[in-house]
């Protein structure tokens, strides 16, 4: 049983928490959570890389780039889910399936390109180089996307209120973002291992 002071504390916290999911603050919440989860996924992936490659240090600029690219995706995702909910009204199974299909066919490749192009250019590559990397890794990325996101989005569109959609995706995406960091930086890590003679 929670004490009276505990209940008062929770009510106070809820008072600060609720505005983050309403009105103009919702887009800020969605934007920052998107960047934060992409950065967290990169931190997890870098921790794995450091454990596998002794002497390797954490690349904070890489994590900062992940945060920036994630924040740039936040507004798109915010308005994308609003559009899906406006165009496919309700959470009947037919509409949910349509939302998932449109999300997979439109948003997934768009956000994949956004991620690879944004990260590539922030890491100092030319647009052409970033575009080539996306082309080289697209099918691996897209097949993995189809394995993860349709089921996650079925839950999202069927059970959750619209204001929590981006936050839910950002929480589920922690594992996905770790994978994206791995996929994006895999070649760099392999080159570093070979140069150090640890491959």
From Swiss-Prot:
Q: Where in the cell is it found?
A: Membrane; Mitochondrion inner membrane
UniProt record, GO biological process: mitochondrial ribosome assembly
Q: What is its main location?
A: membrane
Regions that span the bilayer = 25-45, 64-84, 105-122
Which key words tag this protein in UniProt? Membrane, Mitochondrion, Mitochondrion inner membrane, Transmembrane, Transmembrane helix
Q: Do the record's keywords include Thylakoid? A: no
Q: Which Pfam families match?
A: Mpv17_PMP22
- Identify its membrane topology class: Multi-pass membrane protein
Q: Which residues form a coiled coil?
A: none
Q: Which GO CC annotations does the UniProt entry carry?
A: cytoplasm; mitochondrial inner membrane; mitochondrion
UniProt function note: Required for the assembly and stability of the mitochondrial ribosome. Is a positive regulator of mitochondrial protein synthesis.
Q: Which family does it belong to?
A: Belongs to the peroxisomal membrane protein PXMP2/4 family.
- Subunit arrangement? Interacts with the large mitochondrial ribosomal subunit.
Q: What is this protein called?
A: Mpv17-like protein 2
Q: Which organism is it from?
A: Danio rerio (Zebrafish)
Q: Which gene encodes it?
A: mpv17l2
């Amino acid at each position: 049983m929670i004490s009276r002071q505990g209940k008062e504390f929770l009510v106070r916290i809820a008072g600060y928490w609720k505005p983050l999911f309403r009105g103009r603050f919702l887009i800020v919440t969605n934007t920052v959570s998107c960047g934060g989860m992409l950065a967290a996924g990169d931190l997890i992936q870098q921790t794995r890389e450091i454990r596998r490659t002794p002497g390797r240090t954490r690349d904070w600029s890489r994590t900062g780039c992940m945060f920036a690219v994630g924040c740039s995706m936040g507004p798109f995702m915010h308005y994308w889910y609003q559009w899906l909910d406006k165009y496919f009204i309700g959470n009947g199974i037919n509409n949910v399936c349509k939302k998932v299909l449109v999300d997979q066919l439109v948003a997934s490749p768009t956000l994949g390109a956004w991620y690879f192009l944004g990260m590539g250019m922030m890491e100092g590559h030319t647009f052409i180089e970033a575009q080539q990397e996306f082309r080289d890794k697209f099918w691996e990325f897209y097949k993995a996307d189809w394995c993860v996101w349709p089921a996650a989005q079925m839950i999202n569109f069927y059970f959750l209120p619209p204001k929590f959609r981006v936050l839910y995706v950002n929480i589920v995406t922690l594992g996905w973002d770790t994978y994206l960091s791995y996929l994006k930086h895999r070649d760099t890590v392999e080159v570093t291992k070979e140069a150090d003679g640890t491959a």
